[in-house]
């Protein structure tokens, strides 16, 4: 019977990494892994890109300090023009926000406050709903199906005269599921005639399904659809807080009135550079794929069921209460995802660097095979 140590030695070559001194880590991994001294534990809990900021973005930020005395309006307008060209829309359709979270919140505030309804799957990313509730919105929760994917048929059935927004996070956080392309297009086409459909595409860059559509195409057709994008994930800029919304101009104009936080000049300039740094973009995607393979290998070894992920995290059936597994892993030096009701025996783990993933694997084996 294969022991834990044997498995570590043989699986994907990671055993050698765990059992060897740090000096033999690959040159690529050493040069791109920068330990964050602020957090004494490995953080696989927030779906961040641990390889960012790219060197090009860091240099752009350094050269942009001279502009720190200026208000960011013109800089943001220039970024909006760059994004409009990238996505094939007008600059009036772009709203620069302080991270995509601000975009979600101000959309909920704009359209659903004071008694409006938001229809949303559950579990999902909660920023829009929790904020809108504070301003008098009601939330109509639709549980995900057995496959952890959205039940779009049920969501559409629940649309009523009081429904103002339908929220989709696609791929979904925390489940990592992806709505089938045709089903997504058909749903947005139909539902957007009755209410505004909001498509959160924070993890869109990680999708590997060929020709998978962004709902920006629905915006271009003039549908009542809003799309959110972020620089926090594949671009590795979570700490800089910059994202954007895309909507037809008349919808964008309503949202723009409620923007609270201006993105600062350094974040805007960093975003401009990130859009041009394809080498780092591809590097991040490649590292994410490799990290997911290692985690899948572990979960298969432990006979733990998981959802095939289209993101930079994996949602798996832990067979333990996450409120117990979380502290146990933290004691091993690894922080994993929080509870996502009602799935208290499921766990979301982010893909960190390969070195971080190997420490996660080591901790999991110690817990599950002790």
Each predicted region: which residue ranges?
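N-terminal "arm"/small-domain region of PLP-dependent enzymes with the aminotransferase-like
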Residues: 14-70, 85
